[in-house]
């Protein structure tokens, strides 16, 4: 907790190709060891593959995939009187986006394709069709929240 007040949130610049802040966040999440050029190459190659395979605009497929992966609810552990309850809570919009991107890339990294751009493209296409590991993660999270709906009154 900072003692000197609230720290202003830094705003990311939209990416140069698609002029989208979400794509910039996606690229920043792909990036490892500060190698942004490599991350951009992976992302834009994946978008090229998506456009080729689906015949649709890559950004449309990306946005549809993100909407299918972003969770609405999640559970948070809350300790009450010696018992720990999984309390379902709504997810804030910014966290929804962050979780969606994170789950998408975790699922992409676990895929079997040789190139990362192919993995990302495959996962985005699967997610836009409501299949794939990232969508399954979202469904599992929602099931957990649904199963623990009885503890919703312990909300934060």
From Swiss-Prot:
Give coiled-coil spans as residue ranges: none
Q: Which UniProt keywords apply?
A: Ribonucleoprotein, Ribosomal protein, RNA-binding, rRNA-binding, tRNA-binding
Domain of life, per UniProt, equals: Bacteria
GO CC field: small ribosomal subunit
Listed Pfam families: Ribosomal_S7
Q: Which GO terms describe its molecular function?
A: rRNA binding; structural constituent of ribosome; tRNA binding
What PROSITE patterns does this protein's entry cite? RIBOSOMAL_S7 (PS00052)
Assembly, in brief, is: Part of the 30S ribosomal subunit. Contacts proteins S9 and S11.
Q: Which family does it belong to?
A: Belongs to the universal ribosomal protein uS7 family.
Function statement: One of the primary rRNA binding proteins, it binds directly to 16S rRNA where it nucleates assembly of the head domain of the 30S subunit. Is located at the subunit interface close to the decoding center, probably blocks exit of the E-site tRNA.
Q: What is this protein called?
A: Small ribosomal subunit protein uS7
Q: Which organism is it from?
A: Clostridium beijerinckii (strain ATCC 51743 / NCIMB 8052)
- Per the record, the gene is rpsG
């Amino acid at each position: 907790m900072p003692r000197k007040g609230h720290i202003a949130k830094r705003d990311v610049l939209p990416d140069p190709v698609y002029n989208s802040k979400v794509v910039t966040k996606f690229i920043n999440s792909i990036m490892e060891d500060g190698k942004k050029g490599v991350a951009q190459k992976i992302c834009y190659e994946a978008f090229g593959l998506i456009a080729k395979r689906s015949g649709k605009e890559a950004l449309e497929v990306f946005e549809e995939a993100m909407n299918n992966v972003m969770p609405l609810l999640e559970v948070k552990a809350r300790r009450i009187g010696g018992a720990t309850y999984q309390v379902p809570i709504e997810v804030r919009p910014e966290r929804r986006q962050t979780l969606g991107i994170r789950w998408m890339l975790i699922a992409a990294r676990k895929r079997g394709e040789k190139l990362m751009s192919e993995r990302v493209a495959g996962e985005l296409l699967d997610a836009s069709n409501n299949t794939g590991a990232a969508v399954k993660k979202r469904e599992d999270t929602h099931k957990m929240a649904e199963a623990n709906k009885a503890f919703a009154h312990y909300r934060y």
